């Protein structure tokens, strides 16, 4: 018998009080610390690449919105450290606003921030060599996971389409599901995917302002990418990617 697990999950994660939804008191002072603690993933033993500080973006916002599009044609140039710095900071970095908790450049349900960003650089240079990195959002720096050139065959092991081999880099988004589900139960899984979408549009708009080509990519080979990132695919798993260059 065929079971449509996507429909089953969607129904099971609806906000129904009689279906085991986590009961969230209206008074935040009664919440457990796990609901309000902001967790940051880091690699304390890995080398670091400090990214450039915030710089103003040029361009009229309405014009950026008009120009925003997906492209599969890239300039075939090495990654630019300054542009990558601004791309990460404006699209998924810390926001410069006065809050009682650290804000980001995108909305996150309950400020749980379940998404982690891994830049995978296909075409590098002396500033940022080809390799795999993790974006440390708190410090605005790259954790170096490993550095070595990518072959076309290795890129093909990660993504479905050949044109990706001409890109400069990819941004891989993973979801750390327990950060949301500890507060929102099964429904928290939905919020992880929504957050990936929020970040994705930020990346598109910032890339447009920086004159970087961008294409959201669902044709990922999830298990291969998770092995590349050395994540278990259960507590943390790939949810989205963007190809840039």
Model-derived regions: residue spans:
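N-terminal accessory segments that position/regulate proteins before the catalytic core
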Residues: 1-178, 183, 196, 210, ...
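Short pre-catalytic strand/loop immediately N-terminal to key active-site residues, enriched for Gly-Thr
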Residues: 186-195
């Amino acid at each position: 018998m065929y079971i449509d697990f996507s429909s089953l999950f969607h129904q099971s994660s609806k906000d129904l009080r009689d279906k085991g939804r986590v009961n969230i008191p209206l008074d935040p002072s009664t919440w457990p610390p796990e609901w309000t603690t902001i967790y940051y993933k880091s690699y304390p033993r890995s080398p670091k690449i400090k990214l450039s500080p915030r710089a103003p973006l040029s361009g009229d916002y309405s014009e950026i919105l008009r120009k925003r599009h997906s492209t599969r044609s890239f300039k075939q140039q090495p990654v630019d450290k300054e542009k990558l710095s601004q791309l990460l900071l404006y699209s998924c970095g810390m926001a410069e606003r006065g809050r009682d908790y650290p804000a980001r450049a995108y909305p996150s349900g309950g400020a749980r921030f379940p998404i982690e960003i891994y830049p995978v650089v296909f075409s590098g240079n002396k500033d940022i060599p080809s390799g795999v990195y993790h974006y440390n959002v708190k410090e605005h720096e790259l954790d170096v996971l490993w550095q070595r050139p990518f072959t076309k065959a290795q890129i093909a092991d990660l993504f479905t389409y050949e044109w990706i081999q001409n890109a400069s880099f990819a941004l891989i988004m993973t979801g750390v599901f327990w950060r949301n589900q500890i507060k929102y139960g099964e429904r928290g899984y939905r919020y992880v995917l929504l957050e990936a979408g929020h970040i994705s549009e930020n990346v598109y708009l910032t890339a447009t302002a920086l004159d970087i080509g961008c294409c959201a990519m669902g044709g990922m080979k999830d298990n291969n990418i998770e092995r590349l990132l050395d994540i278990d695919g259960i507590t943390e798993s790939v949810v989205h990617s963007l190809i840039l260059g």
